[in-house]
């Protein structure tokens, strides 16, 4: 798991393949598909816990939509600022969002109802992927406004060091 000690930046440490940081699993290759799957499963669990509320006929549809946006989506989006979302993960996120809306409207997966008709009935405004992109851009803007920080230097690619020959 561990390799030779790190000697740059005067830090004594070792290189590991993966570690947990602020509740997120960070891997050496930067792959975060497992983290996205974990958050989607947590969101699915929250959605199933809301079943009794979502099946209630006393609560109107706009309130149910707002409940999903406020109670389910933040669980899924926790830490999404650091994710690298590929096409496969994008499809998973879109499928999860539509699963939430189908569950909200009590439409079975066997029903031949288009996704567009669901979205038209719900009218959610911004998609889950769009909300994630908004959070990423807000975080990027926050980093760029900082005066002198390691994160800003890293994002701009201005780490000065000697490059080996070759």
Identify the residue ranges that each predicted region occupies.
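Short linear motifs embedded in intrinsically disordered, charge-biased segments
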Residues: 1-166
């Amino acid at each position: 798991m561990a390799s030779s000690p790190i000697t740059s930046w005067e830090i004594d440490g070792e290189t590991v393949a993966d570690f947990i940081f602020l509740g997120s699993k960070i891997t050496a290759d930067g792959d975060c598909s497992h983290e996205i799957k974990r958050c989607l499963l947590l969101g699915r669990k929250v959605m199933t816990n809301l079943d009794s509320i979502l099946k209630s006929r006393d609560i109107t549809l706009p309130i149910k939509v707002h409940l999903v946006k406020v109670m389910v989506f933040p669980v899924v989006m926790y830490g999404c600022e650091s994710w690298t979302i590929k096409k496969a993960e994008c499809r998973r996120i879109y499928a999860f969002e539509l699963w939430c809306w189908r569950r909200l409207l009590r439409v079975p997966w066997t029903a031949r109802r288009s996704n567009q008709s669901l979205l038209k009935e719900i009218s959610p405004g911004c998609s889950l992927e769009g909300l994630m992109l908004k959070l990423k851009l807000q975080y990027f803007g926050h980093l760029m406004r900082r005066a002198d920080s390691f994160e800003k230097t890293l994002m701009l690619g201005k780490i000065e060091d000697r490059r080996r020959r070759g």
